[in-house]
């Protein structure tokens, strides 16, 4: 009996030594006290309770998420552009132009001192018109009328087709190429001079199938032009823009090359327009200086985005009378949010252009003083 007691004492002592347990009354106790055990047990219960709530909430959130996705899919079904689905995101290169009809006037155009459109740009413009055969074309920015002549020539065999051209400049040389070289085209041409596009849009009317924009190049230039014509365009209208890479391609071999480096407006709005992109064939996507966009359906869902593009720092400020005309136009054809964005942008840039000496130089470049 004594041996058993001795063995028990030795084992107890060893356990105390192993777990470093000591007691004042020399009674053996376990490492975890009752209070610590209850505390851990309580924590475990709380954790399990929260886990159950989380799993339940996850199921509820998943159900709500699926219902939202279902609603979005219904919305997208109504508003998603068919072309956007079918075309994907790749650009389309017009490799094979119909050039026969252009070749008829090519020599005459080359002999006439005309605006700066290179051979491939002229062929591209002709190719777009021949491919899509628009009935109603609008041109903004005419100058001598080289592009006007190309488009008029391209629609000679398109029944009931007509070109409307607008230029802010009202001097005599505007459209001279058409008047002098191609008077036989005049039956399909209407020219407006001396005011902004908003002034003439109601006269021209809706269902415009194609727009060619080649105007100020400085901001807000082509951005404003696009906003002014947008409410009058047909579904899937073609937007063709020239000089969309001036800020990249301008080098010292061009007259006024340094100024061209600041010509961002065509690049900005062309790459903001929601539509399928058409470019001349070539490897370098950045340096194509002409391109086209075929608008996606339901452009109204992009209206606010287009007005926000105006929010940059303008390089010139239009005449106040033009600003007022545009305000009335926007009030009539866009919603109140678009008008608010326009007003805020105008107020900012009115101060900015006047205070910035660099922009005051652009303010005197005859864009808004003709």
Please identify what each model-predicted range represents.
Residues 2-96, 100, 299-364:
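Membrane-proximal basic amphipathic "stem/tether" segments
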Residues 14, 18, 111-370:
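S-adenosylmethionine/decaboxylated-SAM
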Residues 91-117:
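Class I SAM-dependent transferase core
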């Amino acid at each position: 009996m004594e041996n058993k007691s001795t063995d028990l004492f030795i084992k107890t002592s060893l356990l105390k030594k192993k777990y470093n347990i000591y007691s004042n009354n020399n009674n053996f106790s376990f490492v975890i006290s009752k209070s610590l055990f209850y505390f851990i047990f309580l924590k475990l219960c709380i954790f399990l309770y929260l886990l159950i709530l989380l799993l339940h909430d996850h199921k509820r959130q998943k159900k709500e998420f699926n219902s939202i996705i279902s609603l979005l899919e219904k919305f997208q079904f109504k508003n998603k552009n068919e072309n956007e689905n079918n075309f994907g995101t790749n650009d389309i290169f017009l490799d094979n132009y119909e050039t026969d009809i252009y070749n008829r006037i090519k020599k005459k155009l080359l002999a006439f001192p005309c605006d700066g459109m290179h051979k491939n740009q002229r062929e591209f413009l002709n190719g777009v018109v021949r491919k899509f055969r628009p009935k109603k074309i609008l041109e903004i920015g005419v100058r001598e009328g080289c592009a006007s002549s190309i488009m008029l020539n391209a629609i000679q065999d398109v029944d009931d087709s007509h070109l409307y051209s607008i230029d802010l400049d009202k001097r005599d040389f505007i459209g001279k190429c058409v008047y002098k070289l191609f008077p036989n085209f005049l039956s399909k041409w209407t020219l407006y001079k001396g005011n902004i596009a908003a002034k003439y849009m109601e006269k021209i009317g809706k269902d415009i199938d194609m727009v060619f924009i080649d105007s100020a190049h400085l901001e807000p230039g082509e951005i404003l032009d696009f906003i002014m014509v947008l409410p009058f365009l047909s579904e899937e209208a073609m937007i063709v823009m020239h000089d969309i890479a001036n800020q990249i391609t301008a080098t010292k071999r061009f007259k006024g090359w340094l100024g061209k480096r600041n010509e961002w407006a065509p690049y900005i709005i062309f790459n903001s327009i929601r539509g399928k992109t058409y470019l001349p064939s070539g490897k370098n996507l950045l340096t194509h200086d002409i391109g086209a966009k075929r608008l996606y359906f339901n452009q109204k869902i992009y209206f606010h985005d287009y007005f926000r593009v105006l929010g940059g720092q303008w390089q010139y400020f239009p005449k106040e009378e033009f600003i007022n005309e545009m305000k009335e136009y926007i009030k009539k054809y866009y919603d109140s949010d678009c008008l608010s964005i326009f007003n805020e942008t105008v107020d900012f840039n009115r101060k900015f252009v006047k205070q910035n000496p660099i922009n005051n130089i652009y303010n005197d470049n005859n864009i808004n003083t003709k």
